[in-house]
Amino acid sequence: MTALRQIAPEPVPADASAGPELDWLLAALQSNRFMPHPPEGSIFVGDGDYRAIGAEFLGHFIRIGRLKPHERVFDIGCGIGRMAVPLTQYLDPERGSYDGVDPVMEGILWCAQTITPAYPRFRFQRLDIAHPLYNPQGSLPGTEVRFGFANSSFDFVTMTSVATHLPPDELVVYLQEAARLLGPGGRLFLTAFALDGTSTGQERLSFKRWQDGPGWYAIDEAPLAAAGIDSRFLLEQTALAGLTVEALRPGHWRGISAAHYQDLLIATKPGGKGVGGTA
């Protein structure tokens, strides 16, 4: 078993504007039965309550990632809208925007048919990226992914439970694409199982190293069902992609007290404040 020591220059400061109003919004999102919700049998991403997890991450985006209502969001691995649905209640309908991509057609169709008609600045597209679990017949290798947006198109890129299903060589490509797509001051919000060889003895997952590389896996039958990555490799590749790492925060999968389950990387595109609000 392995775990990560805290590797961060300093904790990311909480957004001072994220006060009682945000608490009210997050509670409302969990209890509002009129919010879009996919049929139970069609939810193919993760476990747990769809609304509660979406609301939780909206809180993380704002408090930790410093997401603002006017910003342009890119959701890599948007699934069936678990992050998009709560964002409809936060992003400014005239200045903010959201684009999500995923290889699973069912999720994209549900989002495009359910969310976009009511929120036209929320857009979804399927990319036929090959993945042994989610899209085994995909035509595009993960090492050749290039998202169809111009440089600096976004202020906030999220990869929630994406790195946990990628081999190291594909993760490097995604980091490079995130850096390309972020405008100056933009943030990457990425969750991962980041490992450095230490252990708390309380981890909920036990990882084994994949051959001699920086990748790890927890499930023998399906290595990419829960993939880990060397923390040093993750930090180095994020920097090589052109981003400045602000923090790598350990998650409570390790058996420790934390606000989030997976480890959380926050990295920033150098160059000042983002230039959101144009889409």
Predicted segments with their positions:
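Class I (Rossmann-like) S-adenosyl-L-methionine-dependent methyltransferase catalytic domain
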Residues: 2-64, 80-91, 95-148, 172-173, ...
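Conserved class I S-adenosyl-L-methionine
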Residues: 70-79
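Short glycine-centered segments of the SAM/dcSAM-binding site in methyltransferase folds
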Residues: 72, 186-187
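Structural signature of beta-strand start/N-cap positions in the alpha/beta core
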Residues: 72, 97, 153-155
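A conserved beta-strand element that flanks and buttresses the S-adenosyl-L-methionine
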Residues: 158
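Short catalytic micro-motifs in class I SAM-dependent methyltransferases
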Residues: 161-162
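Helix-capping/helix-break motifs at membrane-protein junctions
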Residues: 167-168
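A short glycine-rich, Lys/Arg-flanked "PGG" loop and its adjoining helix->strand segment in the class I
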Residues: 172-184
